[in-house]
Design a protein with these regions (language model features):
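Register position in tetratricopeptide repeats
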Residues: 34-35, 68, 102, 136
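Helix-start (N-cap) detector for alpha-helical repeat units in TPR-like alpha-solenoids
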Residues: 21-22, 56-57, 90-91, 124-125
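Conserved structural position within tetratricopeptide repeats
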Residues: 47-50, 77, 81-84, 115-118
């Protein structure tokens, strides 16, 4: 019985430490990302997501890092997974659109930016990025109109 209590207490006491470690790992990954140290950030995000695979923000952040490291397809995968987990968040749509632009998938990028603009017609980032897409598609009048909004 004493062994059982000791085991139970060790598990109960370990939970807050584990949560603190996970939060610390998130902060380390975020700091490395913000400092532009993407080579360091990617394995930190990987480790965090092994323990918290349902964290939409972490998936989106890892997607940004993957794009910065030249992996637009991986970035799209992460942003898409983030969208599944948090369908009303606009950041993963914006980030996925940027990755789609890197692959010159103008139609998919435009769809992501338009999704944002349907919800917030004045979103400056979505307007700017959609203007870039329209310019890349050769629709300069539309690009100029969007850039003025």
């Amino acid at each position: 019985m004493n062994r059982f209590l000791v085991l139970l207490m060790s598990l109960v006491l370990a939970l807050p430490v584990q949560a603190l470690d996970l939060q610390g790992l998130y902060e380390q990954a975020l700091t490395a990302s913000r400092q532009g140290d993407f080579v360091e950030a990617l394995p930190l995000w990987d480790r965090f997501l092994e323990q918290a695979p349902e964290d939409a923000a972490a998936l989106s952040n890892r997607g940004n890092v993957r794009l910065a490291l030249g992996d637009p397809s991986g970035a799209i995968d992460d942003q898409s997974a983030s969208i599944v987990l948090a369908p009303e968040e606009s950041d993963p749509h914006l980030n996925r659109g940027t990755a789609e632009e890197a692959l010159q998938d103008w139609s998919a990028a435009a769809d992501d930016y338009l999704w944002i603009l349907e919800r917030d017609p004045q979103d400056a980032s979505a307007l700017y990025n959609l203007a870039n897409v329209r310019g890349s598609q050769g629709d300069w009048p539309e690009a100029r109109t969007l850039a003025r909004l």
